[in-house]
Amino acid sequence: MGWLDFSSKSKKEEKDDTRPSFTWGDNLNATDWQHYTDPRTVIPTILLTTTILVSTRLYRSYLRRIPEAAYIRPGFFRKRSLFGTVTRVGDADNFHLFHTPGGRLAGWGWMPGRKKLPEGKDLKNKTIHVRIAGVDAPEGAHFGKPAQPFSAEALAWLREYIQNRRVRAYIYKRDQYDRVVATVWVRRFLVRKDVGKEMLRAGMATVYEAKMGAEFGDFEAQYRAIEEEAKKKKLGMWSGKKKDYESPRDYKTRTANAAKMLK
């Protein structure tokens, strides 16, 4: 009987020896690329990235608060509107707006941190100066110049109409005084009203007469028709004698020329 050779390897063991050997370091540093191409990983990643990009764009375009007119991007003009609260009416055809993008849906008026708007000195550098498009109100007393007739009445009218109210301004451009020229709408008794039209209707303003830079949106013809109606009814600034009437544009031209002559 022959001796069994225990030192010899079976064919299976010899075959196994041909497999490459791995170390623990290889296993720890190995990259499982299949994990990154697995639909269970790819699809959630794409959805999350898309959501972040869309949310960022939505915030920048519609929900980011604009503190002053200088911060309005050129691409916004004639394409976007500004919603906010009128904090101050300093003149009869312009006012200051605290921008509240998204309105109550974005938490303005009820959410902590947005429940109450700033007041007084806290509003400095936080409001947008808005010039109402298409109309010109009687000039108040400025820089030593006398006030025009009905300037006080026009200012009081505008304050009563929009002060502390939420308005929407459809913006056209920024003027030389860093004001935003806009058609402004306000809700009065649940009805949206064009503030410029209502000023003309009440005889508290004229149609803007400047030869250059006038902005009306699509309402110039309507504005002129409403002005003519107020003239016929002798409302507001049209109630005096025709010979005594001086338009805001003529007043500004006359006082500017007088100031030049004094230099």
From Swiss-Prot:
The chain crosses the membrane at residues 41-59. Disulfide bonds: none annotated. Ca(2+) binds at residue 136. SUPFAM superfamilies: Staphylococcal nuclease. One of its GO terms (molecular function) is metal ion binding. Gene3D superfamilies: 2.40.50.90. GO terms for cellular component: membrane; mitochondrion. The active site is at residues 131, 139, 179. This is Probable endonuclease lcl3. It comes from Botryotinia fuckeliana (strain B05.10) (Noble rot fungus). The lineage of its organism: Eukaryota, Fungi, Dikarya, Ascomycota, Pezizomycotina.
